Amino acid sequence: MSLGNARPLVSVYTEKNEPAKDKNICLPAVFKAPIRPDVVNEVHQLLRRNNRQAYAVSELAGHQTSAESWGTGRAVARIPRVRGGGTHRSGQGAFGNMCRGGRMFAPTKTFRRWHRKVNVNQRRYALVSAIAASGVPALVQSKGHVIDGVSEFPLVVSDEVQKVQKTKQAVIFLRRLKIWADIQKVYKSQRFRAGRGTMRDRRRIARRGPLVVYDKDEGLRKAFRNIPGIETINVDKLNLLKLAPGGHVGRFVIWTESAFARLNDLFGTWKKPSTLKKGYNLPQPKMANTDLSRLLKSEEIRKVLRDPRKRVFRSVRRLNPLTNVRQLIKLNPYAEVLKRRAALAAEKRTVAKVLAKAKKQNVELAKSHFANVATKAAANRAKLLAARKKKVAAKKPAAKK
């Protein structure tokens, strides 16, 4: 929860979803701690590995047969082969991981490094981040919890809930506080697991529901344990695996009044260290307000910032003037005149050849289409040149007498 959104007081709600009179609690400093999803995810992955049970294949697997290599000189692989004869099995490869009935490559051992050590301060940082994220409604809703009717976040209820001993009373309590919609989500999500887990007593899977954090168990655990999705935990034994299942922050947490009031003693504040954890100080956020858009648009920062640069840097296209005519004309404008002269000279030579050939063969030019076109082009060119000469002569000033 950012410092800008934190409230100084939190209301305590009764079993009937009514704010208790004169029972407002100061928001613990742990809810203002920085939220670090990266730390939570990393620590969760390490802690989850500590629950694994050691497994390995049998040391004798794949070696419970008599086999010996035939050696070299028989044009067959040197893999050990089963002894004997009179059966399909004799002569077949054995022992190797590429053989049928052989052992696996690098057989698994029970002395693998199953557990991972996590620094105490890192574990506490992840736990603090998960608690702080549970007080942000947007993060809780993004996790998939149905919290449309919940009155306030973080949700704190009176200690009378700890005395509930019947599941029927617990269901009534959840319905009154508008939490039952989240339990219905759990009911709808119940399904059979895909894979081998169905044969290993892990048949059904479902979504997670709310987490109830209490201080003293006076029947609360037995009352809530038969409701799907709901989990309970003591405030002194807060666990990251329950506060951030899957390594994702935003679990919906219901706090009892006494458990909520105990958070300052457990994690301390920024003015005094924790009284229950030796030498632990609550991590401070590097930014008091995490709304970057609001900060960058503020007048104080805008006065210091310089105006944006509006220069446009265009990349220069490197063109070869020997192959690109436009680039050649750009570098040497007279090249256009030379090219035009060369084209005219070539056309003139072509016309001369056609005329000479027609004269030699006594062919009339009117009947020859190419010669006719060439003569017309020559005539048009002569007209254009004459018109240009007239324009140039008209522009020249008349000579004085």
UniProtKB/Swiss-Prot annotation:
It comes from Drosophila melanogaster (Fruit fly). Belongs to the universal ribosomal protein uL4 family. This is Large ribosomal subunit protein uL4. GO terms for cellular component: cytosolic large ribosomal subunit; cytosolic ribosome. GO terms for biological process: cytoplasmic translation. Pfam families: Ribos_L4_asso_C (PF14374), Ribosomal_L4 (PF00573). Keywords: Ribonucleoprotein, Ribosomal protein. One of its GO terms (molecular function) is RNA binding.
